[in-house]
Amino acid sequence: MARLKEIYRNEIAPKLKNELQLVNVMEVPRITKITLNMGLGEAVGDKKVIENAVADLEKITGQKPVVTYARKSIAGFKIREGWPIGVKVTLRRDRMYEFLDRLLSISLPRVRDFRGLNAKSFDGRGNYSMGVKEQIIFPEIDYDKIDALRGLDITLTTTARTDDEGRALLRAFNFPFRN
């Protein structure tokens, strides 16, 4: 079992139950999935870009990403319907907790000029989104073998009903929030 999953079950869940004054353990907010998305606008003319992004995301997560395609043509962005424009991965269960552990303990401290995460990046329903400017903060990516620096979006979906519950959950996981 993943280290953070055990910590959640044994320490975080009972603490949050008391803190939020919940009756049932199943009411305690928990992280259901983590979605990583890499939007690749520059992939319009080059298939290699998609292949490299798929390889990078696969190294980071240990799971094969899905290529996302344009739903409709947009002349301003020079894309046509059905063209590949990004890659995404959804992590659940043990892989999700292992990725979260690596993100908090190894990757985020490697971000240049890191002052903490924005505590206001909640969506109103307890889900948290953050952006990473460079994929090289992950130790699985070899700096010498990358073709371009690419950013990615990380979304943590929780069962929290409000932003305050979600914030309490992520603070219990020791998320480094700014304020």
Curated annotation (Swiss-Prot):
GO CC annotation terms, alphabetical: ribonucleoprotein complex; ribosome
GO terms (BP aspect): translation
InterPro entries: Ribosomal_uL5 (IPR002132), Ribosomal_uL5_bac-type (IPR020930), Ribosomal_uL5_C (IPR031309), Ribosomal_uL5_CS (IPR020929), Ribosomal_uL5_dom_sf (IPR022803), Ribosomal_uL5_N (IPR031310)
Signal peptide: none
PROSITE patterns: RIBOSOMAL_L5 (PS00358)
A GO molecular-function annotation: structural constituent of ribosome
Keywords, sorted A to Z: Ribonucleoprotein, Ribosomal protein, RNA-binding, rRNA-binding, tRNA-binding
Pfam families the record matches: Ribosomal_L5, Ribosomal_L5_C
Stored HAMAP family: Ribosomal_uL5_B
Family, similarity comment: Belongs to the universal ribosomal protein uL5 family.
Subunit text: Part of the 50S ribosomal subunit; part of the 5S rRNA/L5/L18/L25 subcomplex. Contacts the 5S rRNA and the P site tRNA. Forms a bridge to the 30S subunit in the 70S ribosome.
Role, per record: This is one of the proteins that bind and probably mediate the attachment of the 5S RNA into the large ribosomal subunit, where it forms part of the central protuberance. In the 70S ribosome it contacts protein S13 of the 30S subunit (bridge B1b), connecting the 2 subunits; this bridge is implicated in subunit movement. Contacts the P site tRNA; the 5S rRNA and some of its associated proteins might help stabilize positioning of ribosome-bound tRNAs.
Name of the protein described by the UniProt record: Large ribosomal subunit protein uL5
Organism in which the protein naturally occurs: Azotobacter vinelandii (strain DJ / ATCC BAA-1303)
